From Swiss-Prot:
Keyword terms of this UniProt record: ATP synthesis, ATP-binding, CF(1), Chloroplast, Hydrogen ion transport, Ion transport, Membrane, Nucleotide-binding, Phosphoprotein, Plastid, Thylakoid, Translocase, Transport
Site (Required for activity): 363
Cellular component GO terms, alphabetical: chloroplast thylakoid membrane; proton-transporting ATP synthase complex
Compartment(s): Plastid, Chloroplast thylakoid membrane
HAMAP family according to UniProt: ATP_synth_alpha_bact
Membrane topology qualifier: Peripheral membrane protein
Entry protein name: ATP synthase subunit alpha, chloroplastic
InterPro entries from the UniProt entry: ATP_synth_asu-like_sf (IPR023366), ATP_synth_asu_C (IPR000793), ATP_synth_asu_C_sf (IPR038376), ATP_synth_F1_a_nt-bd_dom (IPR033732), ATP_synth_F1_asu (IPR005294), ATPase_a/bsu_AS (IPR020003), ATPase_F1/V1/A1_a/bsu_N (IPR004100), ATPase_F1/V1/A1_a/bsu_N_sf (IPR036121)
Gene that this sequence comes from: atpA
GO molecular function: ADP binding; ATP binding; proton-transporting ATP synthase activity, rotational mechanism
Reaction catalyzed: ATP + H2O + 4 H(+)(in) = ADP + phosphate + 5 H(+)(out)
Entry annotated with the keyword Cell wall biogenesis/degradation: no
Keyword Nucleotide-binding in record: yes
Lineage of source species: Eukaryota, Viridiplantae, Streptophyta, Embryophyta, Tracheophyta
Amino acid sequence: MVTIRADEISNIIRERIEQYNREVTIVNTGTVLQVGDGIARIYGLDEVMAGELVEFEEGTIGIALNLESNNVGVVLMGDGLMIQEGSSVKATGKIAQIPVSEAYLGRVINALANPIDGRGKISASESRLIESPAPGIISRRSVYEPLQTGLIAIDSMIPIGRGQRELIIGDRQTGKTAVATDTILNQQGQNVICVYVAIGQKASSVAQVVTSLQERGAMEYTIVVAETADSPATLQYLAPYTGAALAEYFMYREQHTLIIYDDLSKQAQAYRQMSLLLRRPPGREAYPGDVFYLHSRLLERAAKLSSQLGEGSMTALPIVETQSGDVSAYIPTNVISITDGQIFLSADLFNAGIRPAINVGISVSRVGSAAQIKAMKQVAGKLKLELAQFAELEAFAQFSSDLDKATQNQLARGQRLRELLKQSQSAPLTVEEQIMTIYTGTNGYLDGLEIGQVRKFLVQLRTYLKTNKPQFQEIISSTKTLTAEAESFLKEGIQEQLERFLLQEKL
């Protein structure tokens, strides 16, 4: 017969009582009233915060954007096809954040920082809020270091500095993405981390950009954040903030970063779609009233940090698409007023074979020569002036047939200067090569050549100077100034190559 031992039973009961946990977990829940078009209306969720993440029963995550008196408007970060009316939703108590680490370099990710390049998971120990406040006035210092794009027209006349925000604006198919990708290629060896954010583009276009960066070894220092045209509007809206959070991670670690948003018109359209579906009142061009804040809070995160914070920088190149050159539309005017200048690409110039199709007359950099080395300042001033005079004369010359010799010479010089600004895609030039090219043009060495010979001569001149006059490049890179010694090396090289070239052409 089994004996019952009372002491053993009482010990077991005591242990169980000690193990009993009286903690009460409070979950803020709600019920789905309606779902569709990437939007869900939730009843309940009484204590939810604006921008808080909520989780649906079947695993979809959403963001609470509209807090109304009797329901909460949630935008879905997925298709939400499995969400049913009446199913439960719980608030997570978290704001959207992403993991960040050095391991993201060379990878293609989506707006939630998940890899989409098929190369496995990315390890990360830290995380950052997708929307974090921009550095304040005390945390910044003025922009003073150049960020070279490798394009003569930009680096000489519309210079960009580290920590600046420069808008690239133009119609579709005018080479906006090409300017941005060339700038990434030119950062090779410059210790600059690049982030390319593709918003609402064709997957084939993004693949093309990634391939061209891989072929030239630029993916080593680049992160691509891509949300293609078939992505939900919520993710297209979040993608630029994800890119900014990744760039900020490196900026606060005393590194220099460059971020390209391609393009913000698509982000504004995604935000407009979300806002209209949430029944927010539409404003101009049916955009919601806070579309300016959408872009200003993103672009204000670009900064040149003060010496106390390590002097890191984040340079932003937002891209905006115009409709038949209309820069006075809502989104273009908004972004122009937020940024520190704009590079205007013209369809007419592009079709006339002037590529990059930069309209130098209406492009501007509000940082200006503070973002140039001294040697570039020395040669660029003359180029700007001569091109401006040429543009004026060219318009005047259309109405007059008999021009005096001086005017004809000025027109001829202007045409050759315009020729030297032309560059092939994915062929950025070093700052030394740019200086020698501009010097050759502004000092009349190209005047004796036919327009068709200019580019051929310049290519040969760069090679000749590199091999026969390496002292010129050494002086520029060490002193950052066009000294009298450097100028004499340059003059000798140009004269020697010009004689060789003219002999060659005669044969």
